[in-house]
């Protein structure tokens, strides 16, 4: 096997290697990322595919960068899985390909058409798909002109009947940036931290007329992105002033005036990681922060 030295997990007698998988999926027909008994999920499909291709005795256990909700899409999702080196070799067969390339090819053949693995590679030392990440970037697409609604894009674009004022929305988003407690925009989970660093939140009018929101943070809590979008839509329509989202933020509790927007407009576009030599330290830091 060539390329980066494998990230070995566990004792020398039980050496396992860590693989990084980059994938995309149309979330329309999935009940989110996380495996749930009796429901079709991305994790369930991918774990089953890996288990089948590598003929594993137990279902493959996956760690994901961002646990997307039901209906949310991903163009740049990242996952890691720990396996034994001889298990990876089973993907090669008679293909003559490198094991990682062979696994990616075979997974593309096994997975359903609404999910695809773009790349498989040996993870650098210290890599953790979730905790090594320094940022996640989401995109939200809106059509605010009924005459320009494209039925062919109905699975990824949310349609509104009222035009939105981009300048007003961007004036409001600037007040949300930085390290803050976003409890007012998160679905409450017992013991879970709601402190996040919002690095970017802006709206742009694209050449095709769609409005695109780009939201970047170190991490997001449950339903945070869709609530942030929902807080800005009434600013764009003029129903609320530009100070409204910041006022909601300071309350620290969910506000019934903030609508959690539909899932299908949201897509995980990119997950950012530090340089290889900083991966392990970042993972330790992130774990400690989540446990605070």
Give a label for each model feature.
Residues 2, 7-292:
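Structured-RNA-binding interfaces characteristic of tRNA pseudouridine synthases
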